[in-house]
């Protein structure tokens, strides 16, 4: 443990970023691939096509709800463990890991029960009634995905805990193993077995079981913060502090769910008013297309969040040890890297939308599908650089213990701006208004985030910056 602590406090910041961020990026990218790979194979199955794509778009926010709870537990535990180790409080760190395990299992079982009981109402709430085919496919996909929620949540919650224990490589491998299995099984179940949406969902769940099993294996062999038998219970005071640190991750994800629900319903409502998309055979196109755009955005944000979240143990330890100069250096490099990622994503979205669309089976679709998809990529993602910097700011504030500031900024972006503009702008611009909602939200959020960035730099240049 001492060697690990010394490494976090003395090694070059750039090297630490590579060691911790790269595995985290890969883990999140691979985790994102579960749903993205499903959508790619679904779209390229001629008997599913855009109806299956639209159904996947309907169900996707519901998996994000599970992810939101899992990352609140996992990221909160990760930050708490890192700060505790920086202060030399190993016992507290171990108790928090035990609490995280219990919380993730209990919450996943409750969520699964709710999903199975209220499935039809939930699907309708997220825009699944756009037409009969989409609703039917969404029902089938959602049922099997719900059965895998406990495994998915446990694996996602334990991933950052494993990183905090000092083994980001195993965290990456556990996620990668499940995703690879999913990629192998998807074409077999969808194309060979002709299982359709059920096949895509079953492949996903089997991959999630593998990831969860590897997480259990690691928990039994943890290096630094292995909990004892008495630690596997809910320690009230620790849970409160841990969840406070993870609340930003939760709100960031759950508010995205609210935004997606608003967007899906606005696409359904204003698509029904459009000359083309009001026709039954084209009604699912806006939802299917925006779902594809969101998958590309998810890939980019997985890189951005992975880069920032991977640095949480480094930031937490150095803040706990009072080494603010190192934290400031890391923040500077992080913002620069995130801006570069955003710039690359912007070039792809603006310059090569047709090629991106082709990955999701556009060859089987009408020209209306392709034309709307090109417009969606170029409009919805035109402020990717600011979106990436904003995300980095949210997570960094969380890492240094400023949970309230991070939470408020995240809520303003996703709920006040994201949901607000998704509901407001279509009233004036129709379907195009849905596409305008994201860039407008990112510009206004950056205005606020810029002030917080300046304030954070000032505090890191002075003595007495606080943690927790």
Pin down the residues of each PLM region.
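Short alpha-helical transmembrane segments in multi-pass integral membrane proteins
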Residues: 1-21, 81-148, 192-247, 315-383, ...
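Small-residue hotspots at the loop-to-helix junctions and early N-terminal turns
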Residues: 50-61, 138, 142, 201, ...
């Amino acid at each position: 443990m001492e060697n690990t602590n010394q490494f976090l406090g003395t090694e070059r910041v750039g090297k630490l970023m590579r060691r911790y961020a790269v595995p985290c990026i890969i883990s999140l990218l691979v985790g994102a691939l579960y749903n993205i790979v499903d959508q790619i194979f679904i779209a390229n199955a001629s008997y599913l096509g855009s109806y299956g794509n639209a159904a996947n778009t309907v169900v996707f926010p519901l998996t994000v709800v599970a992810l939101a709870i899992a990352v609140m537990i996992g990221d909160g535990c990760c930050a708490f463990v890192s700060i505790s180790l920086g202060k030399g409080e190993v016992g507290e760190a171990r108790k928090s890991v035990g609490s995280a395990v219990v919380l993730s299992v209990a919450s996943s079982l409750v969520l699964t029960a709710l999903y199975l009981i209220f499935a039809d109402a939930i699907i309708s709430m997220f825009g699944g009634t756009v037409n009969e085919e989409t609703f039917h496919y969404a029902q089938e996909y959602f049922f099997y995905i719900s059965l895998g929620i406990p495994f998915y949540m446990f694996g996602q919650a334990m991933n950052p805990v494993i990183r905090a224990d000092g083994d980001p490589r195993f965290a990456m491998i556990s996620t990668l193993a499940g995703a690879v299995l999913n990629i192998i099984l998807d074409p077999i179940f969808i194309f060979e077995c002709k299982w359709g949406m059920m096949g895509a969902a079953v492949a996903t769940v089997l991959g999630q079981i593998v990831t969860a099993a590897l997480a259990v294996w690691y928990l039994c062999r943890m290096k630094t913060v292995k909990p004892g038998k008495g630690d596997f219970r809910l320690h009230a005071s620790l849970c409160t502090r841990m969840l406070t640190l993870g609340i930003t991750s939760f709100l960031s994800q759950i508010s995205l769910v609210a935004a997606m629900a608003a967007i899906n319903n606005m696409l359904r409502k204003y698509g029904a008013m459009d000359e083309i998309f009001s026709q039954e055979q084209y009604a699912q196109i806006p939802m299917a297309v925006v779902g594809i755009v969101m998958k590309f955005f998810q890939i980019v944000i997985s890189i951005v969040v992975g880069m920032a979240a991977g640095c949480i143990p480094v930031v937490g330890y150095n803040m706990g040890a009072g080494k603010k100069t190192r934290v400031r250096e890391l923040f500077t490099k992080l913002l620069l890297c995130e801006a570069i990622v955003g710039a690359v994503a912007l070039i792809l979205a603006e310059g090569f939308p047709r090629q991106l669309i082709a990955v999701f089976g556009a060859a089987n679709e009408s020209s209306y599908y392709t034309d709307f998809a090109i417009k969606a990529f170029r409009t919805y993602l035109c402020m990717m650089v600011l979106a990436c910097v904003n995300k980095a700011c949210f997570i960094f504030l969380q890492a240094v213990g400023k949970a309230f500031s991070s939470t408020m900024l995240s809520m303003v972006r996703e709920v006040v701006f994201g949901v607000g503009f998704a509901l407001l702008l279509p009233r004036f611009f129709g379907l195009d208004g849905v596409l305008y909602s994201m860039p407008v939200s990112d510009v206004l959020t950056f205005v606020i985030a810029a002030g917080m960035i300046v304030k954070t730099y000032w505090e890191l240049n002075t003595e007495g910056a606080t943690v927790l």
